[in-house]
Amino acid sequence: MRSADQILSLINAYIDSLPYNRKPVSLYEPIRYVLSIGGKRIRPTLMLLGYNLFQDDPERILAPACGLETYHNYTLLHDDLMDHADLRRGQPTVHKRWNANTAILSGDSMLVLAYRYVAQCPVEKLPAVMQLFTETALEIGEGQQYDMDFEHRNDVTEEEYIEMIRLKTSVLLACALKMGALLADASPADADLLYKFGEQIGLAFQLQDDFLDVYGDSRLFGKSIGGDIVCNKKTYMLINAFNRADEAQRAELAHWIELKTFDPAEKVAAVTHLYNIIGIDKMAEEKIAHYFECSQKYLDAVSVAPERKAELMAYVARMMNRKY
């Protein structure tokens, strides 16, 4: 079996070797840029680790695994444009380095390339793989639309938020694990268990991302801390701050949400202080731990020897202990 670090090296080498030699250069250069500025490569790593539970040659599925990474980066490229984000992984976003039209068109091309790479799998697996990938892509779009809709609502519930992040984030991690299992000839039951495992891990991962947006280190995080607060994003933390706040705290939160002109650093500091007083930081940490613990029962039920699961378990544990 390969270690997660060995798998990551395979993925990075494969991505670096992708020949973006079509023209015009102005279309493909942003794609090369997006895929070269780092990233944790979580989705292709999970796909190869899922495959490696059942088979010992994960390099066979590098093309579809990197298709998922290309798709993921396509979504980030368009998300950054919609969010007016200046930085991604500590580097200028595509629409800042080039322009909005380039971000749209290069992103569209990344989506097409993602399908090309994912389709590079055994022909007998193609229908199941493409059905899984297409359904996942549709769900991610639905999640993004919910996220945008929430910007105009003040009554978003915790349940609605969890469903939104399941669609926007969790399903792609779940897809990666299930696709790896399908390509490794795993049983349908084991493939479905890995999907459910990925869903729970994805929920924990996104909640952790929300947490780090407030409490992370911007030097490690690769983008400005407090961006969700500045934009009044309906996160698990903001929703529950309103739910748990007393009358005075709720009024102060509402004051910062309603302000049209403000100093961003002052707003982030004030809202973070309220989170701390209300206990939202601890509440979020407990919710993250809950989903991580729930995930383990699905992985435990996968019918392979425990020693074959060790690397996947260790990798996911490292994901949950990240600081960025």
What are these regions (language model features)?
Residues 1-324:
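All-alpha prenyltransferase/terpene-synthase fold signal
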